[in-house]
């Protein structure tokens, strides 16, 4: 994924930190060797204006991203860049992750569907944001990655809040619907109908919509009376959402057929 090409206005209500990395975030352990790198990352995101939500920044300061990437990439875990996690997939850049969570705005006690679990990092952040009382259901189409996510969530203490399921994320998980929030970490040509249907009245979904080579982060909201509204945020680049209501496995051929 590439970095977004558009920025955001810094929220003037966000309190300024003290100098450097001495800003004390709640829930941090001084013994964590990656603590300073994680705080620097969070502070850089805050100063950029891309992520201004205090709750999201605090969650990102607590979740150890280095434990959700392969060991050979841990030295780069707190750079604002995507990293490979195997099977042709990536863990998204922290700035884009934070932006998505800020737009999604999950609250304690809510039920969230996380489409595209990957290594489990965003599911862990969602767990932080819906605790206490919330639940996260994460869908991953690649069995090996689903198991990798389970292992990562287990060792970081989030398995009690997050359930990882292997399946076609474009179909959602109707057995646990409706959801207060749905986050999709893969690009679709249009909002998948099952996901819109599984969104609760008053709920919100954040999903990248567009072609495989460029998308717009799109916020889809369902009003209390069931009407659906869309608004757009920033340009992003995600891997395609492979599935019945997304792109086909041979998405490159499918894409070029559209443009012939």
Swiss-Prot record:
Xref: InterPro entries: PCMT (IPR000682), SAM-dependent_MTases_sf (IPR029063)
Signal sequence residues: none
UniProt GO molecular function: protein-L-isoaspartate (D-aspartate) O-methyltransferase activity
Catalytic activity, reaction form: [protein]-L-isoaspartate + S-adenosyl-L-methionine = [protein]-L-isoaspartate alpha-methyl ester + S-adenosyl-L-homocysteine
Subcellular location: Cytoplasm
Keyword presence, rRNA-binding: no
Chain intervals for the UniProt region annotation (Disordered): 1-27
GO cellular component: cytoplasm
Assigned keywords, A-Z: Cytoplasm, Methyltransferase, S-adenosyl-L-methionine, Transferase
EC number(s) given by UniProt: 2.1.1.77
PANTHER family from the UniProt entry: PROTEIN-L-ISOASPARTATE O-METHYLTRANSFERASE (PTHR11579), PROTEIN-L-ISOASPARTATE(D-ASPARTATE) O-METHYLTRANSFERASE (PTHR11579:SF0)
NCBIfam families recorded: pimt (TIGR00080), PRK00312.1 (NF001453)
Protein name: Protein-L-isoaspartate O-methyltransferase
């Amino acid at each position: 994924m590439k970095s977004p090409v558009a920025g955001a206005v810094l929220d003037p209500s966000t309190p300024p930190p003290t100098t450097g990395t001495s800003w004390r975030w709640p829930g941090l352990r001084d013994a964590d060797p990656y603590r300073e790198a994680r705080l620097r990352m969070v502070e850089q995101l805050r100063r950029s204006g891309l992520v201004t939500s205090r709750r999201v920044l605090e969650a990102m300061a607590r979740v150890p991203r280095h434990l959700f990437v392969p060991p050979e990439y841990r030295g780069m875990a707190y750079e604002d860049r995507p990293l490979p996690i195997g099977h042709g997939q990536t863990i998204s850049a922290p700035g884009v992750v934070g932006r998505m969570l800020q737009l999604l705005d999950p609250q304690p006690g809510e039920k969230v569907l996380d489409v595209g679990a990957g290594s489990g990092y965003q599911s862990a952040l969602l767990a932080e944001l819906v605790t206490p009382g919330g639940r996260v259901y994460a869908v991953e189409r690649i069995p090996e990655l689903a198991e990798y996510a389970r292992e990562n969530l287990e060792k970081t203490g989030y398995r009690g809040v997050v359930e990882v399921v292997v399946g076609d994320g474009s179909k959602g998980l109707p057995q646990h619907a409706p959801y207060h929030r749905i986050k999709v970490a893969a690009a679709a040509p249009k909002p998948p109908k099952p996901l819109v249907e599984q969104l609760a009245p008053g709920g919100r979904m954040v999903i990248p919509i567009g072609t495989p080579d460029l998308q717009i982060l799109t916020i889809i909201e369902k009003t209390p009376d069931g009407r659906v509204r869309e608004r757009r945020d920033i340009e992003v680049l995600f891997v395609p959402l492979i599935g019945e209501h997304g792109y086909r496995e041979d998405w490159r051929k499918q894409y070029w057929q559209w443009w012939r």
